[in-house]
From Swiss-Prot:
Family matches, as SUPFAM superfamilies: ATP-dependent DNA ligase DNA-binding domain, DNA ligase/mRNA capping enzyme, catalytic domain, Nucleic acid-binding proteins
InterPro entries per the UniProt record, alphabetical: ATP-dep_DNA_ligase, DNA_ligae_ATP-dep_bac/arc, DNA_ligase_ATP-dep, DNA_ligase_ATP-dep_C, DNA_ligase_ATP-dep_cent, DNA_ligase_ATP-dep_CS, DNA_ligase_ATP-dep_N, DNA_ligase_N_sf
Sites where the protein binds ATP: 210, 217, 232, 261, 296, 367, 373
Catalysed transformations (reactions): ATP + (deoxyribonucleotide)n-3'-hydroxyl + 5'-phospho-(deoxyribonucleotide)m = (deoxyribonucleotide)n+m + AMP + diphosphate
The protein's name in its UniProt record: Probable DNA ligase
Cofactors, names only: Mg(2+)
Gene: lig
Species the sequence originates in: Rhodococcus opacus (strain B4)
Cleaved signal peptide residues: none
Disulfide bonds: none
Length: 503
């Protein structure tokens, strides 16, 4: 297939807000691929390279001289082959050799193809083909039910591998995917609840009520003497957290996969600010700040996969090997006990509680109602779409944030409000320094950003409004913190915002 056809597909997907049209457009492209083209094309249309990170940034590619070709003639295989060659370059003179390979490729591409390549190589490709949309398209193109495709993706963590299995082996190949110790699975996610009473009413009394910590999500894998630790985005941080590795290596088991949180504590045992915990992920300078693990789930133990087991069984497995490292929680408390546990969590400096169905399996990568988070105030994780230059004491700083919710159908984030409340002097300075790195456009008053940054917003509620495209507006929104552990795909959807409407 010609590379230009993939570029056209990307353009068409990005030009529509309709999930149905996105899926149909992707399905049509996928059905025309040769077997060897499936893996790279699915990766590209998901905004990534099948080779992973290859050490290419804007400095490498932006000034490569090349006159665009008049006719589109480069094939998918040629582009993928060049990227593989670039990825394999190492040693002395590697930068020059990478530029040479890319210059040769760029000289054979049209202007549209080069623009797509530049954005793909530098991680700046955004065409609206989010993972859920691509998963649907793979199922449709392979003429398979969606559930085995979705499950295979959640267990493999990679859409290209899932697509290859779907096209080559159908349902049998997809169901062959299993939890593999050492390979992270996508984490199960929680939905916000209006109140403890609402969560209790929806899930009934057959629940676990646990502290919701103000920490960083971790997934811990142990296979014999080897321990590997991953973030919620599946990035490995094993080398940055030796104290967690040592602790898990001492647990009385031979193989395990735990889900949990980690955080730094003060001398009095209260949680330190979230940013201090995050500073440990890759920061040598923060090694004197010890992290503590708090596990709340066990997905595998000593050769037995537990993903499909009810939460109650998974908690029993966790209790057998790591009772002293479990997040504080109650099993089947009465309503009074649950309320007391909620108050205790707040008094200890934590965010609130999680209410979880004891009968639910671990739905990797899914945000459902089996887990519900309860906080004293409403909070949303939103995408920063832009920022306005301040005035008065904020003159010279990027201040008033434009906030967007995720479109569940894969379109661009939907603006739902603005705020400058809660911004400290340090945050104002950080925004002013950082935002230009994510800039897509600007005018005299505003710098508009690519949807890269996620910020946690506290708000009093939501109201109907015609001021913003989503038909909603945030009430008394204020910035709590930025979430470097989350991507735009982790932001709350417009449906989550709408669920906070009164009545």
């Amino acid at each position: 297939m010609l590379f230009s056809q993939i570029v056209a597909t990307s353009r068409d997907v990005g030009a529509t807000r309709s999930r149905k049209v996105k899926v149909a457009t992707l399905r049509e492209a996928l059905t025309r691929l040769e077997q060897a083209e499936v893996e790279p094309v699915v990766a590209w249309l998901s905004g990534e390279l099948r080779q992973g990170r290859i050490g290419i940034g804007w400095r490498t590619v932006a000034d490569i001289p090349a006159t665009p070709a008049d006719v589109a003639a480069v094939t998918v295989s040629e582009v993928d082959g060049t990227i593989s060659a670039v990825a394999e370059v190492s040693g002395s003179g590697s930068a020059a050799r990478r530029r040479e390979l890319l210059a040769d490729l760029f000289a054979r591409t049209t202007a549209d193809e080069r623009d797509f390549l530049l954005r793909l190589l530098t991680g700046d490709l955004r065409q609206g083909a989010l993972e859920g949309v691509m998963t649907d398209a793979i199922a449709a193109a392979a003429d398979l039910p969606i559930e085995p495709v979705r499950r295979a993706f959640m267990l493999s963590g990679r859409l290209p591998a899932t697509a290859v299995a779907a096209f080559d082996g159908g349902v049998d190949a997809l169901t062959a995917f299993r939890l593999e110790v050492g390979r992270p699975v996508r984490p199960m996610l929680a939905s916000p609840a209006e109140s403890l009473a609402d969560a209790w009413s929806e899930l009934g009394g057959d629940v676990s009520v646990e502290y919701k910590l103000d920490g960083a999500r971790i997934q811990v894998h142990r296979n014999g003497d080897e321990v590997r630790i991953f973030t919620r985005t599946l990035r490995e941080i094993t080398g940055s957290v030796p104290e967690l590795v040592a602790l898990v290596a001492r647990l009385p088991c031979t193989s395990a996969v735990f889900d949990g949180e980690t955080l730094a504590l003060t001398d009095s045992g209260r949680p330190r600010p979230f940013q201090e915990t995050m500073s440990r992920f890759g920061a040598e300078s923060a090694r004197d700040l010890l992290l503590h693990p708090y596990f709340f789930d066990c997905l595998h133990l000593d050769g037995v996969d537990l993903l499909d087991s009810p939460l109650e069984e998974r908690l029993k497995a966790l209790e057998r090997v790591a009772p002293q490292h479990r997040i504080p929680g109650l099993i089947r408390p009465d309503s009074e006990g649950a309320a007391t546990h909620f108050d205790d969590a707040l008094a200890a400096g934590h965010e609130g509680v999680m209410v979880k169905s004891l009968t639910a399996p671990y739905a990797a990568g899914r945000r459902g109602r089996a887990w519900q988070k309860v906080k004293p105030e409403h909070t949303l994780d939103l995408v920063v779409l832009g920022a306005e230059w301040g005035y008065g004491r904020r003159t010279g700083y990027l201040s008033n944030l434009h906030l967007g919710a995720r479109d569940p159908d894969g379109g661009a984030p939907i603006m739902v409000g603005k705020t400058f409340k809660g911004l400290t002097d340090a945050l104002l300075q950080w925004q002013t320094d950082e935002f230009p790195r994510h800039e897509r456009a600007r005018d005299d008053h505003t710098v508009y950003l690519h949807p890269d940054l996620v910020v946690e917003i506290e708000l009093d509620g939501v109201q109907v409004s015609t001021r913003y495209p989503g038909g909603l507006a945030l009430r008394f929104a204020r910035v709590l913190r930025y979430r470097p552990d989350k991507t735009a795909a982790d932001a709350d959807t417009i449906d989550a915002v709408r669920s906070l409407l009164p009545g």
